Amino acid sequence: MPGRLMPLARSYAYRGYTRLPHDRVNAWRERASGRASVAAFQRVLGSGPVEIGGGLLKGALLDTRALTLTHVQAFGLVRGALEPSVQEALRRHVAPRATVYDVGANIGFFSLLAARLAGPDGAVESFEPLPAAAAGLRRHVALNDARTVSVHEVAVGAHGGRAQLMAVQEESWSHLAERGRHPDTQGVLDVEIVTIDELVAGGMRPPGVVKIDVEGAEIDVLDGMAETIRAHSPVIICELHGSNAEFLARTSAIGYVAQNLDGPEPIAEAGGIHALALRAG
């Protein structure tokens, strides 16, 4: 199929697979015939990119080397339905020509969305310390000709230096070793850590929006951008991993108001959620 027809066809195939009953699919995959069929299906889908079928990033291309039929986020990515509350928050707060920092960018879904929203005069600084995810991020930047996205293969924290990163089979759950060992940990990587304050002081364009998804290290990221917050008041969109009370305390102390993006439940009483924090007034 010429042009974009084949990526679109692969996208429909992925989405069709997700409509099958989950329990039956799992039982089928356990059988030898099912495993062989899944492997064959994966080879077809992996033969080239797929087109995102909906949402704010509809029409963008995904590299299927970053996806498998068992990838926990694969179907949300292909449907364009990944973390809709975060997508909507970016839509509301990323204006044309904005600068967005994507901290914990993974393979780049939100970096691409931020680039689309900010337009050709915007800038997206994407931070991803895990080599495999950073490679997927670079492929997505190239595949979509996202020239305003810059990829930084580093972690972001409270202090510059180096630290150990627990690499987990499901890449989106990898985290700094000081946060504890995940049961699916496959290895430990030595990574560079930078702070947002250091980057801005060194000449990087200051952010108007900072999106944070760092599997428990979100308070460290905030501590490392205290001066940037004071000087530039960026909008903060953050996934919380048990740090709800501390996030509220930190944002309140710097004159921000935080709200739960995922529902009406107060942040302090919620579990793992996405939060939005804005300068009060």
For each of these PLM feature ranges, what is it?
Residues M1-H140, N144, G203, E269-G281:
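S-adenosyl-L-methionine
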